[in-house]
A protein has these predicted regions:
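NAD(P)+-binding Rossmann beta1-loop-alpha1 motif at the extreme N-terminus of oxidoreductases
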Residues: 1-52
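Helix-loop-beta segment of a Rossmann-like dinucleotide-binding subdomain
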Residues: 92, 106-118, 157-169, 220-225, ...
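Rossmann-like NAD(P)(H) cofactor-binding subdomain of soluble oxidoreductases
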Residues: 53-152
Length: 326
């Protein structure tokens, strides 16, 4: 089984290291810069459970060096997909499956979903439909990623907590390709449930991200602080209820109540969201996949999003001023 991880940052590097150490697959990564140089020189190192492991991976700067794969795991952020298309497509053979590990609403959302929106392309995450055309939604295996992982230094990945990667076909089918990949990941020591409704699980994670991420970026607050404050907690709750109405109109099942989801966020403690961390470090922010796409879904389903609209306007303006959004 030939697998390439495209984007070997924290999550991509962790998955690559786990699969490589298990030694059951022909594992390659596409990386760049100091990270790539370190991996080529010293291998990919993983710190997990107090131990440092050396993962034997093939690292390349260009996908052309690797050729067609059985599986390509896209572990880069959503806003990086379109610029990377020329690099990704050389990895795609006739039967290559593509595992999408981006946060937020996926570009393939309306593939094999049925109903009047079948085949709709979301401009917020796939401007001009380029990803849809060049990768093809028929290749996709959806996923929801839960591990907390850090890049401590170039070539050095540190696992913090969590080992679950949920997988699911857009159609809900338990196909041979998703089953085989899940089995390999489980043998590598990961928890990999195969879902018959991956969209609902995507929404439950998105539910918190679309609210807490922009609020944290706007206020500089941690999750615990946002939940402890009556004003910001109410703001997050209102955004979540607007999103829930959209999701339910699309057939999504929310297995927990909104207040329980908010409490869970607060219980995480003094944690800065990824969007706040990106803002502080001057990096591109995941605004479109986490917030703009939900607004677009609201327009498609005729569900009002006044609070989401207002927060989106503010966080987008802030990001532009800081050079974190264009």
């Amino acid at each position: 089984m030939k697998i390439t991880i495209f984007g070997a940052g924290a999550i991509g590097g962790y998955l690559a290291a786990k699969l490589a150490v298990a030694g059951r697959t022909e594992l390659s990564i596409v990386a760049r810069g100091a990270h790539l140089d370190a991996i080529k020189a010293d291998g990919l190192r993983l710190i997990e459970d107090g131990q440092e492991l050396l993962a034997p991976v093939r690292a390349a700067a260009k996908a052309e060096e690797l050729g067609a794969q059985d599986y390509v795991v896209l572990a880069l952020k959503a806003h990086s997909l379109t610029p990377a298309l020329d690099q990704i497509t050389p990895l795609l053979g006739q039967d290559t499956a593509v595992v999408t590990m981006q946060n937020g609403v996926p570009w393939w959302y309306f593939h094999e979903v049925g109903g009047p929106l079948e085949g709709t392309r979301l401009n917020a995450v796939d401007p001009g439909g380029k990803i849809w055309e060049r990768i093809g939604p028929e290749r996709v295996i959806g996923s929801v990623v839960y591990p907390a992982v850090e890049v401590d230094a170039p070539g050095l990945i540190r696992h913090v907590e969590g080992k679950r990667f949920s997988l699911g076909e857009p159609s809900g089918e338990r196909s041979e390709r998703v089953t085989q990949l899940a089995e390999e990941m489980v043998k590598a020591g990961l928890q990999v449930p195969v879902r018959d409704d991956i969209r609902s699980e995507i929404w439950v994670k998105l539910w918190g991200n679309l609210s807490f991420n922009p609020i944290s970026a706007l206020t500089g607050s941690t999750l615990a602080a946002i939940v402890a404050d009556d004003g910001t907690r109410t703001l997050a709750r209102t955004m979540m209820l607007e999103a829930q109405a959209i999701g339910e109109s699309l057939g999504v099942r929310f297995p927990i109540a909104v207040d329980r989801r908010i409490k869970g966020a607060g219980d995480v403690g003094e944690h800065k969201t990824s969007m706040l961390q990106d803002l502080e470090r001057g990096r591109p922010m995941e605004i479109d996949a986490l917030v703009t796409a939900v607004q677009e879904l609201g327009r498609l389903t005729d569900k009002p999003t006044p609070t989401i609209d207002a927060v989106l306007t503010l966080v987008r303006r802030l990001a532009v001023e800081r050079g974190c959004y264009s």
